[in-house]
């Protein structure tokens, strides 16, 4: 994923920053506890497509 694009994207729920997980092909929002999929290089920033992050994934 292009780092310039990542700097512009925000979580649609919290408007907070997103972190890219290359291995899982996801953008994560720690504040919303959601992970948005990236498919074929395109971030899918729909809450209905996101999965909830566990405490373990958040390092809590």
Swiss-Prot record:
It holds the Pfam family Trm112p. GO terms for cellular component: cytosol. It comes from the Bacteria. InterPro entries: Trm112-like. Belongs to the UPF0434 family. This is UPF0434 protein Rfer_3156. It comes from Albidiferax ferrireducens (strain ATCC BAA-621 / DSM 15236 / T118). The lineage of its organism: Bacteria, Pseudomonadati, Pseudomonadota, Betaproteobacteria, Burkholderiales.
């Amino acid at each position: 994923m292009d780092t310039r694009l990542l700097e512009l994207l925000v979580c649609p729920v919290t408007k907070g920053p997103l972190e890219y997980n290359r291995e899982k092909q996801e953008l994560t929002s720690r504040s919303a506890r959601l992970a948005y999929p990236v498919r074929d290089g395109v971030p899918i920033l729909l809450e209905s497509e996101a999965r909830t992050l566990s405490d373990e994934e958040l390092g809590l």
